[in-house]
A protein has these predicted regions:
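C-terminal long alpha-helix characteristic of the crotonase
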Residues: 2, 52-104
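Acidic, divalent-metal-coordinating active-site segment for phosphoryl/phosphodiester hydrolysis
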Residues: 38-45
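Short loop/turn segments at beta->alpha junctions
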Residues: 27, 42, 57-60
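Generic anion/oxyanion-binding catalytic loop in active/binding sites
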Residues: 11, 20, 35-36, 54, ...
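CoA-thioester-processing core
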Residues: 1-34, 49, 64, 68
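Structured beta->alpha junctions
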Residues: 35-38, 72
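Terminal peptide-recognition signature
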Residues: 22, 46, 83
Length: 105
């Protein structure tokens, strides 16, 4: 049932702010398709684009989210914190720098 869209172009605007996150999570071609057409995509297409990682039927959503939360909460909070910080830090680095950085984490 979920749909995704960057509709600004449909009303004479460009979705500049959503473009930042979109362009960092899907291919350039897919981002431009969404940004330039303003068309709505369904969950299956969003998954194909890499915008989402899983499609869950509405009736199971709370159960699935709860399971993810429990699984993550069962891990070391320090490891999760360190891992998240490293993930986002290395994403902005050149490849060689990212490997050097993560080798020290």
């Amino acid at each position: 049932e979920a749909t995704f869209c960057t509709p600004g172009v449909n009303i004479g605007l460009f979705c500049s702010t959503p473009m930042v996150a979109l362009s960092r999570n899907v291919s350039r071609k897919q981002a431009m398709e969404m940004l330039l057409t303003g068309e709505t995509i369904d969950a299956a297409t969003a998954r194909e684009f890499g915008l989402i990682n899983r499609i869950v039927p509405r009736e199971y959503l709370n159960q699935v989210v709860s399971k993810y939360a429990q699984t993550i909460a069962s891990k070391s909070s320090l490891v999760i914190k360190t891992g998240k910080e490293a993930f986002y830090a290395q994403a902005e680095m050149a490849l060689a720098d990212a490997y050097a950085y993560t080798g020290r984490v």
